[in-house]
Amino acid sequence: MNRRFQLLTIFVLLVSLLSAQNNKVEKQQRLTGRANISGKTVDYTTDEVMSQVAVQLFALPDSSFVYGVTTDDGGWFNIKKLNVGKYYLRMSFLGYQTQDVNLEIVKDDREKPIGVIKMQDDAIMLSEAVIQEALPPTQMVEDTLMYNVDAFKVPDGSVLEDLVKRLPGVEIDENGAIKVNGQTVTRILVDGQEYFGNDQNMAMKNIPVNIIDRIKTYRRKSDFTRITGVEDGEEETVLDLRVKKNMHKGWLSNYDAALGYPVGENDFSEWLKALYSGRVTLNRFQANTQFSMNANTNNSGRGGGVRKNTQLGVNFSKNIGEPYPRRRNEFPLVVGGNIRWNGSSSRSLSESESETFTTEYTSSSFRNNRSRSNNENNSVSGDGRIEWRPDTSLTIVFRPSFSVSRSNSSSRSGSVTFNTDPYQATDMRDILNEYMNLPAEILDSIGVNSQNSANSNDNNSNQISGNFQISKRFNKERNSNGRNLSVDMSFSKNGGESISRSATKQEYYQRHDRDTIMNRYNVNPTDNSNMSGRIMWTEPFDSGRTSLSLSYQIQASKRETNRQTYVLPVTGDYEFWDQHWYVPSELQQYLNGELSRQATNVTRNHTISMTLRRNTEKINFQMGLNILPQYTGMDNFKYMGYEIGDTSRVVVNYTPSISFRYRWTRQKSLRINMNSRTSQPSMEQMMDITDDSNPLNISKGNPGLLPTLNNSLSLEFSNYIEESRQTINLNMSLSNTLRSISNKTDYDPETGVSLTQPMNMDGFWTNWNTNGNFSYQKTFKNTKYRMSASTNASFRHQEAYMRTGSIGNYNESAGTGGAAVLSTTETVSAGQRASFTYRDNEWVELTVNGNINFNHNENSVRKDGNMDTYNFSYGGRVNVTLPWKNAHIASDINMSSRRGYSGSYNRDDLIWNASASMSFFRGNSGTLRIEYFDILNDESNVNRSVSATGRSDTRNYNINSYIMVHFIY
């Protein structure tokens, strides 16, 4: 009780101190006159209101800065308490001419309306010519980073994905995940409206670049925060596309058809003879209505293996009624939603070389593996949104969603494990193809085991969910930080069935008496349901600048599983793989009760929160304290022959949170966040039972596991210097886990079998990491030159226990026969990326770039190993526009190198791509484009992963070299 009282006392003192400091800052900025000015900004051509326009007030005659604001959602701005004198207002926004308005405040002025200021495009008409200054590629406004699309040259007919890859500070990984200055993008919007929910591929692969005017990226607040004005800490990074004004007038259609073929040898020639892609988009973007229909199909997507994809989708949104006065984005009724179908089939091939760290480095485990897999997926999903505002004080939001999916997959793999590095002990270079040719005495000396396996899975799942929110404001003024009552409820229900088959054949070179063949068939039906509810009351103080929120939330879930495992016979003379897919008609007689699992898992989490907020012109501060009673229970647990009755656990956690933001100007700000989160180990982890379904990787539960506490601290700084057109972003974070759960590993060097058991690590810094990202962009004064650079660095500390020796009877205890040794792995990573671009108006764009990434890994057990890796590349890109038929020629070439990897993975890849296009028809509406990727057929894909117990290098085989011919209309 004393500890809780101390926390509460510190909480109140800190908030009181900050509140006093905020009042001090506010007085320094407060104007002391009696005149108020107001105005509104709109687009000169369309008369649409413009939000986030920078409004700066300067005093005459010395042009000293007095005050600055930005326009609200309705385009309005207000500056209060001006002194008598002469001033001028300056309105500025990316892509528009700066507007200056002179004004004079005299003694009797109280309210002085400026009127409507019309913002013109950043172009000046002289006779029949247009002189247009090139716009800066990036600009910061508040927390929003904006990209001017015209500053980035892409081939005609390109889609959003082609453009985003070239934006400074943006990275797209092999899975399509987008990061902007280290922040992961979770949603794409069009003119502020959701576009196909969280399915980013619908936007990335379908929206043509030629309709986009600007891309904004910012942290979008949750529905709860947007309708209540109360921060709940739930934000997501989004890309918001602004459509060109002349594209708002009617229907927009775009068609793209392409054919091609792979060049050179590849590992998928039997399945893929030719390449194709097709895309049809139909869009209508208006002020209050959006409609999109997309269809595309292709088998030329780059990534792991080869993939055939087909997508169909419809998206719509509609604002009904007139917006409420001075609330541009608040309509009486807003409806929207989407439905989409995704179908794909893929083939993949990968190889890996891994090392498991053991307590004696001379007997480390080295494993080579090759796997091939096939996957088929089909899904239909959709979500909707209904937002109803009977008046300005009441908002009701309902979001339903559903999904139905069917998938099947199959894979085959082969592996071999050695007790020493095979590249040093033998002359082999293609281990998996050559190890069987080794003399028996050598294989029995350095070989540990080999495994061949085949797996297949058939899955189906159905899901339905909904979220309902209602918020009542008791203060109808524009400031939403008033008294507020809100209720939030959600539910979800999903179920399905998974049928899997697995067959494995193990040979142990040191213990041939343990050679085994296993053939198993699993049926696993699931039924899950979740419900949650939250109620929050917010009470304002000090004219709404300070508020106190009290909330209660309950979350309940129930998961039912009933996995049935059948051990199929392995007898007689047969070809192992031929019988793998055979399922006996009398399946029930092979049911194995020891390997089957039946359980009902129930959780109930309660959250009681108190949050104090303080908002001023420059400072936003929030401090909260959460009390979380948590219940977890498992009923009717049956597994591996054990029958366990009701098992439950109750834990109460206390987690603080602090959020601080300081804003010097609308373009310069600092944000600091600290959060703590608790998590419970799963009930499966806590059960003292052993699972040997994979004979080489056996797992065992630990009933003594304790909950973990994760602490995170993050810092974000952003600044845009308008005079020199420089953008600076800095992100830093520190995270650690108290009582973190790591796997204790027992490794048997005779058989290569590993037994893992989860356990809590002691100490505050047993598992922690820190990272930082700094990015810089600059456009030079004549706007022909621009540069961008980014630096990232990270450190990670991981701990786990390991033991080498005979495992013995693992059903009785894990790790018997010797003491475990602490294995610590520390990883330092650093990277630098830079590019320089020259653009001569619309004719030539030339870019040179380079990057280097370094990873240093040290392990306390494997002290003699060099695990440093280097990845570096350098090259350039050129785009040339010719006056004849709007012809474009583009080419890029990069040398990509790897060092420090296993075997043949160290290599230099010279990657050269080229494309050419020309336009036809009226208005250049038709485009013919030819593309040649990886002309030298030299690209390869390799990555490394490191943990506290081992490292692994993996190579994925792809079709990288191919030609495509497009016709786009």
Give the label of every model feature segment.
Residues L60-W76:
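Short, acidic Ser/Thr/Gly-rich low-complexity loop/linker segments typical of extracellular
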